[in-house]
Amino acid sequence: MIQPDKYILSASILAADFSNLSNNIKDLKKFGCKEIHYDVMDGEFVEEISMGPIILNSIKKHIDLPVDVHLMVKNPEKNVEQFSKLNVEVITFHYESTNDHKSIIELIKSKNIKVGVAIN
């Protein structure tokens, strides 16, 4: 049997209707969302390009949910500083996106942020 308190529902902002983003964000808690999943894509590591820290800064003004920043970018260590200033709870990077895993893990931890590692 699935125990709801042992799982976290994390909603991706990319799935939102951007013309109604404010209302979509307000609805998240009502639907049991416990965390925001914020995809960052650079057009190099993945083909698509998505939002950066400026948009997340605006979004965080309207939510009180933890944020997991998912860096789908080449050289993710270049993005850690910007997102750490936004008081995010987790930064996830792709194992394949960097050769220096130890350094980026230490960098993220030095900002008192939890580390996530995504593997394709």
What label would you give each PLM region?
Residues 36-53:
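Glycine-rich, proline-tolerant flexible connector loops at the mouths of alpha/beta enzymes
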Residues 5, 17-20, 62, 78-79, ...:
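Conserved anion-binding
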Residues 27-33:
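A short, Lys/Arg-enriched amphipathic alpha-helix followed by its capping loop at the start of a domain
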Residues 1-15, 22:
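N-terminal amphipathic alpha-helix/helix-capping segment at the start of soluble metabolic enzymes
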